[in-house]
Amino acid sequence: ESYLFCFEQPHDFLIYDKSYDLAGHRDISEFEYINDVGVKFYWATAVFFRKNETNKIFFDLLQHIQENWNHYRLVFQVGENLLRNDHVFSIAIHIMNGYQHGNFANKMPGKLFYTLDKDICWEISDNEITFLLEKQKYHGEYTLCKWKEHSIHVMNKYSLNRCIDKMEL
């Protein structure tokens, strides 16, 4: 429902810059900035954009950054070799803002909830997902959590695929 708001507002590009870990106890600093020099983190999970010349430049820039990832990850001091679309989007937004905080990207409506790859998607049924969330200070031990009627970004794709494969279609 909150995504319908995207079509009623005046901005041409919306993206999440804040997120909420379902476990609620973990360090989320890696999802605030992509590096120590202050490039803000944006989630490429859900994006709204209107087709226009500015956004065409943005998406061309995304492709350029992806094709030249090793250069950009060194320039922007991204510690990981692994290409993450979140990092590519974050760098492109930073460039579109003139290498500073700016207003190219506006906030998506609602909240972006997520589970980490340490968490296990256990079951999907109707409008409910059951997770096993890794406990704080007890690696390998989990807390049962049921998530109902809200979107969520699941980072453990292996367990998500297992649940999808078990679903009756």
Q: Residue spans of the language-model regions?
A:
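A glycosyltransferase accessory/donor-loop signature
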Residues: 34-169
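Short acidic (Asp/Glu) patches
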Residues: 22-35
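GT-A fold catalytic core of metal-dependent nucleotide-sugar glycosyltransferases
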Residues: 1-25
